[in-house]
Amino acid sequence: MLHAKVVYDSSLHFLGFIGGIFAILGVIVLPITSGDTAFRAARLQIAEIFNVDQRSLPKRLLIAVPLFVLGYFISTIDFSVLWRYFTWANQMTAMVMLWTAAGYLYRYHKFHWVASLPAWFITTVCALICSTTKLVSA
């Protein structure tokens, strides 16, 4: 509960009432949409690997229900452990995408710095996360 109070107090103090409400909604909505996207992506990837058509509801549930059960058991793990991996994976995805875009722009003689500089920055962030965060407990 302490984290919720910190978010509430700091959002209202720094952003005012309206900005604070938007910030608090963002803290609630963004993790929910990330979870929704993760479940959808996992379901579609599994369906593609096993060639399961996803047009009918029963076939969607065939894959979704086991994923939800797995998600339930994962949610019983300490949130700080889950968050550690989520933030790392999120930053790594951004880094790979930025370097891919930078490579594409460079190859076709476009202004690649628009992607290269942020890619360099996020690579530094990822390196710092990996060096300062204990991703695997000993």
From Swiss-Prot:
Highest rank taxon of the organism: Bacteria
Transmembrane segments: 12-32, 62-82, 111-131
UniProt membrane topology term: Multi-pass membrane protein
Primary localisation category: membrane
Keywords, sorted A to Z: Cell membrane, Membrane, Transmembrane, Transmembrane helix
Localization annotation: Cell membrane
A GO CC annotation given for this chain: plasma membrane
Protein name: Uncharacterized protein HI_1127
Record organism: Haemophilus influenzae (strain ATCC 51907 / DSM 11121 / KW20 / Rd)
